[in-house]
Amino acid sequence: MHPQRKQRLMIVLFIVVFSSLAVGLIAYALRENINLFYPPSKIAAGDVPHNTRIRAGGCVKPGSVVRSQENLDVRFVITDGNADVVVSYTGILPDLFAEGEAAVINGIVTEAGDIQASEVLAKHDETYMPPEVAEAMKGKGQHQATCGGLNYGA
């Protein structure tokens, strides 16, 4: 093989190997940080993989927030109007977190079908609803500017 041709082949091989390695590392990093969004009805139906980090959203069901007296543990229920999911969280909730308002939860679905939250995000103003929550509720004929007016069921 001609030396110049051999040198070109080595350069091309180096570029291919380096590019493949870079793509592999990027894919691995993104896989660790991707949180798929699921509405409460999909979680309650069991359509969500357990022990996988997800993002869930809905309205905090009125009367469902229970705070521990001993520590920062909080339990509450989120709903999309069709199904309810219990959320457990340890930490300080955002100032705008309230019953009957939209919330987005980052966490892990337990074997029991509950969510162990690592982060709770609350709405920003009286007309804001997270896009994922609005999309999940749109097909139900219950989309509201906020969670007010949502039929929470009995």
Swiss-Prot record:
The chain crosses the membrane at residues 9-29. Residues 30-154 are periplasmic. One of its GO terms (molecular function) is heme binding. Residues 1-8 are cytoplasmic. GO terms for biological process: cytochrome complex assembly. Heme binds at H124, Y128. Keywords: Cell inner membrane, Cell membrane, Cytochrome c-type biogenesis, Heme, Iron, Membrane, Metal-binding, Signal-anchor, Transmembrane, Transmembrane helix. GO terms for cellular component: plasma membrane. It comes from the Bacteria. InterPro entries: CcmE (IPR004329), CcmE-like_sf (IPR036127), NA-bd_OB-fold (IPR012340). It is a single-pass type II membrane protein. Gene3D superfamilies: Nucleic acid-binding proteins. The keyword Transcription regulation does not apply. It is found in: Cell inner membrane. Heme chaperone required for the biogenesis of c-type cytochromes. Transiently binds heme delivered by CcmC and transfers the heme to apo-cytochromes in a process facilitated by CcmF and CcmH. Belongs to the CcmE/CycJ family. This is Cytochrome c-type biogenesis protein CcmE. The gene is ccmE.
